[in-house]
A protein has these predicted regions:
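Mature catalytic domains of secreted/periplasmic carbohydrate-active enzymes
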Residues: 1-279
């Protein structure tokens, strides 16, 4: 189970000492990540954390609107300085191949980058995640020194905890040794690979919950899981809970059906790897 600790908006869903904008101090007044971690681990399930904070840098764009608080100093510690896209720098959403080759600098300032690292370290120390998953935004080569510090911190902590952990990122953020993630099944490798990878796939036609969300059938999801495993990959299935945290019944039913299939066929899934052919 891999909840999002912080999405692009910059609001932490955990008890953070590095920002006042967190779920423990506002809104539900709960450490949502901590509570979920305890519940998941009580069931003997691995627990990971997803962090999208790097994309917060240019999530809030300047606007001509007059009735908003984007420029209010009271909220500067939440929004940060509004950013305009800079065509001369690698995008925070991920540089092009040409930008990587040219070694253009990251658009974020050093203060933001150090804060990003500190928040990652806070999440690592508080929740000891079995997997640390990152969305877009960290695959610029200019961020390699920072990412090296993060990986060293995480792996050294894991050695102290005496347990294996994994990093998962999109594109070639870490080049080798981590789990490459592909967003949606259509981007998955078509052949057996030498490296391990996974697909993050929504249970419906959207990642977040909306009224009338179109849900995939359990057979569709199982087919994608088996396809991926046969090619040395995995499937990270995104669930879309409502605003109150409840999982709609139609999603629950699909999960139960997948669970029933796994009870029968799990031996061919867990602890296995790709063979010489796939299909």
């Amino acid at each position: 189970v891999i909840p999002t600790a912080e999405h692009h908006d910059g609001f932490a869903l955990y008890d953070s000492k590095l920002t006042r904008w967190d779920a423990k101090d506002m809104g539900p007044k709960r450490d949502l990540i901590g509570d979920l971690a305890k519940a998941v681990r009580r069931q003997g399930i691995k627990f990971g954390v997803s962090n999208h904070r790097m994309e917060h840098w240019d999530f809030m764009y300047p606007t001509a609107a007059t009735e908003h608080d984007l420029y209010d100093p009271e909220y500067a510690d939440f929004y940060g300085p509004p950013q305009k896209p800079d065509k001369n720098k690698a995008s925070a959403m991920g540089p092009s191949a040409e930008e990587v080759m040219e070694g253009k600098e990251a658009p974020q300032d050093q203060g933001f980058l150090e804060e990003w690292l500190a928040r990652c370290q806070e999440i690592i120390d508080k929740y000891q995640p079995d997997i640390l998953w990152f969305d877009n935004g960290i695959n610029s080569r200019s961020l390699d020194p920072l990412k090296l510090r993060l990986a060293a911190y995480y792996y050294n902590r894991a050695a102290q905890w005496d347990k294996p952990v994994s990093l998962s990122t999109k594109h070639d953020a870490y080049l080798y040794g981590t789990i490459t993630d592909y967003e949606r099944q259509g981007r998955a490798p078509k052949d057996i690979t030498s490296h391990y990878w996974q697909v993050d796939e929504p249970i419906g036609n959207k990642f977040g919950y909306i009224e009338g969300l179109q849900i995939q059938s359990s057979s569709q999801i199982i087919s994608k899981l088996v396809e991926n495993i046969s090619r040395n990959g995995n499937l990270c299935l995104n669930i879309s809970p409502k605003a109150d945290g409840t999982i709609p019944e139609n999603q629950q039913e699909v999960l139960r059906q997948i669970g029933h299939w796994m009870k029968i066929n799990g031996e061919a899934v867990y602890g296995t790897h790709a063979w010489m052919v796939y299909g």
